[in-house]
């Protein structure tokens, strides 16, 4: 998992507030987009339209959501909590 506190390069590249896109990959379950949005709404409330794309074999889906990030801490906590969803395999 990405540790943004130790990754000064990412912190230096971002100027807050800014748009930040998360790409969450997980099992192809109908609840995946809803669960991703639940976590995002806790830390960055807003009206989001997730983009869902199936994998070639259909076993996995990727859910992309762009938020209005206000701090590096917000970005990091979302990476952590999105990665803790049991049906999620990777967060980019």
Swiss-Prot record:
InterPro entries: UPF0250_YbeD-like, YbeD-like_sf. GO terms for cellular component: cytosol. It holds the Pfam family DUF493. Belongs to the UPF0250 family. This is UPF0250 protein VC_0945.
